[in-house]
């Protein structure tokens, strides 16, 4: 959907006779999509761009091509534009060894004046896009997997990211994703979680924030009660381990 919208808008803006207006709209509305796509084409001619998919969220736009995902900041002219990517990589590199659910393995490259974030595509469909009835049917299974993930992660205290902690280590605190609600990938056939993506706003905080993050921005998940069912499974793990 996003690819069609961006392509249509880009062609529509192309007929605007005043250049500065064309440039302004392409940068502000489409986030300089065409130049970023051309830069990626030039840097990675080996990719099949005919089957490219486009997504956007937070501060980035995402090109999904074959088995790879490429993220670039929407507003690449901003100061410290690379800082969020670098922060996310540090977090994921440090947390990954503690978790059995897949977390993106990030690398960077520059092309056409833009910094791209590249990671292998994790297979699956966004949990929020699965029908409510099906989520409810498999809610216990999903909640168990999420609880195990949060439990595993609660033991992560990597020295390499101590400088990113805003508070000292203490009981009940852990490294949290904070926004899992829209970033859980799941196999729609088995309904097993395949990955947790987009860690740029992760941080060290009270572990209760992780459960809130399962429903915070989605009324659908609030109605299902994914936070409560996951929290109950997590308490069982604490009791028996």
Language model: regions and residue ranges:
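Juxta-kinase regulatory segment immediately upstream of eukaryotic protein kinase catalytic domains
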Residues: 2-49
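Active-site acidic catalytic loop and adjacent metal/ATP-binding pocket
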Residues: 60-66, 155-209
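A conserved alpha-helical element in kinase catalytic cores
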Residues: 30-37, 58-59, 69-117, 133-141
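ATP-binding glycine-rich phosphate-binding loop
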Residues: 44-65
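Active-site activation/catalytic loop segments of kinase-like enzymes and analogous catalytic loops
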Residues: 209-241
């Amino acid at each position: 959907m996003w690819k069609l919208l961006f392509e249509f808008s880009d062609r529509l803006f192309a007929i605007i006779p005043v250049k500065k207006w064309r440039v302004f709209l392409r940068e502000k509305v489409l986030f300089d999509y065409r130049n970023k796509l051309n830069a990626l084409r030039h840097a990675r001619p080996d990719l099949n761009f005919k089957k490219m998919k486009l997504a956007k969220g937070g501060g980035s736009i995402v090109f999904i091509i074959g088995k790879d995902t490429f993220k670039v900041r929407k507003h690449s002219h901003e100061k410290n534009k690379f800082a969020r990517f670098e922060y996310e990589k540090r977090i994921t590199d440090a947390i990954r060894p503690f978790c059995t659910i897949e977390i993106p393995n990030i690398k960077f490259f520059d092309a056409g004046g833009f910094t791209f974030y590249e990671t292998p595509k994790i297979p699956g469909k966004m949990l929020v896009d699965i029908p409510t009835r099906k989520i409810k049917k498999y809610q216990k299974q999903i909640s168990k997997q999420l609880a195990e993930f949060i439990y595993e992660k609660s033991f992560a205290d990597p020295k390499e990211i101590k400088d990113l902690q805003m508070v000292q280590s203490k009981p009940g605190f852990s490294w949290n994703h904070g926004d899992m609600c829209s970033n859980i990938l799941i196999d729609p056939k088995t309904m097993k979680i395949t990955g947790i993506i987009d860690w740029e706003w992760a941080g060290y905080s009270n572990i209760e924030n992780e459960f809130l993050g399962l429903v915070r921005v989605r009324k659908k998940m609030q109605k299902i009660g994914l936070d409560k069912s996951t929290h109950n499974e997590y308490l069982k793990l604490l009791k028996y381990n």
